[in-house]
Amino acid sequence: MIGRLRGVVIEKQPPEVLLEVGGLGYEVQMPMSCFYDLPEIGKEVTIHTHFVVREDAQLLYGFNHKQERALFRELIKTNGVGPKLALAILSGMTATQFVLSVEREEISSLIKLPGVGKKTAERLVVEMKDRLKGWVSHDLFSPAEISLPARESVLRAPDSSEEAASALVALGYKPQQASQIVSKIAKEGMSVEDIIRESLRSLV
């Protein structure tokens, strides 16, 4: 089990980051709520990871805090929720926002998340509400998670909008929907992370 990685950020391709650790490169998928807070390329970072082994792949999911990883693990315990959907859910909302939505039974907020229909939203509330009691009130999440700052340089590549749209598709949105929202959001001077952040806000 790989539980934590400490290394240098080599490449960022939302929602995936490539870390160099001891001469090896690790591809780590992260929810966008965590991805936004990564340092710039060339800087060192510590990521808490969840390791998934499948017949056709070995996957690493990364988080800035242990509490976010704990929530991810609670999500994948829920019937019908796999790692990909859990990643999409935590990209559409911060950990704190999700816990509060479940505690308050805000089905209308949950169904706006990629891949979450009414039945799945209801299942999340029924199966997770008791398990998540006290998570926010006991300060298990940092207040900073509610609004994370952008930490990326402005866009320079002409295909940045395409990169942002690809990231949204990877998170579960339909290609046409992703392209349409990105075309409305993207403006000169915005980073890829900024475009994704604003797109997710408008979709949720």
Swiss-Prot record:
Region: Domain I, residue numbers: 1-64
Species per Swiss-Prot/TrEMBL record: Aeromonas salmonicida (strain A449)
Region (Flexible linker): 144-155
Pfam families tied to this protein: HHH_5, RuvA_C, RuvA_N
Annotated compartments: Cytoplasm
Region (Domain III): 156-204
Stated name of the protein: Holliday junction branch migration complex subunit RuvA
GO molecular function, one term: four-way junction helicase activity
GO CC, one annotated term: Holliday junction helicase complex
GO BP term, pick one: DNA repair
Superkingdom as given in the UniProt entry: Bacteria
Family recorded in the similarity comment: Belongs to the RuvA family.
NCBIfam families, alphabetized: ruvA
Subunit-level organization: Homotetramer. Forms an RuvA(8)-RuvB(12)-Holliday junction (HJ) complex. HJ DNA is sandwiched between 2 RuvA tetramers; dsDNA enters through RuvA and exits via RuvB. An RuvB hexamer assembles on each DNA strand where it exits the tetramer. Each RuvB hexamer is contacted by two RuvA subunits (via domain III) on 2 adjacent RuvB subunits; this complex drives branch migration. In the full resolvosome a probable DNA-RuvA(4)-RuvB(12)-RuvC(2) complex forms which resolves the HJ.
Keyword annotations from UniProtKB, A to Z: Cytoplasm, DNA damage, DNA recombination, DNA repair, DNA-binding
Function text: The RuvA-RuvB-RuvC complex processes Holliday junction (HJ) DNA during genetic recombination and DNA repair, while the RuvA-RuvB complex plays an important role in the rescue of blocked DNA replication forks via replication fork reversal (RFR). RuvA specifically binds to HJ cruciform DNA, conferring on it an open structure. The RuvB hexamer acts as an ATP-dependent pump, pulling dsDNA into and through the RuvAB complex. HJ branch migration allows RuvC to scan DNA until it finds its consensus sequence, where it cleaves and resolves the cruciform DNA.
Region ranges (Domain II): 65-143
Entry note about domains: Has three domains with a flexible linker between the domains II and III and assumes an 'L' shape. Domain III is highly mobile and contacts RuvB.
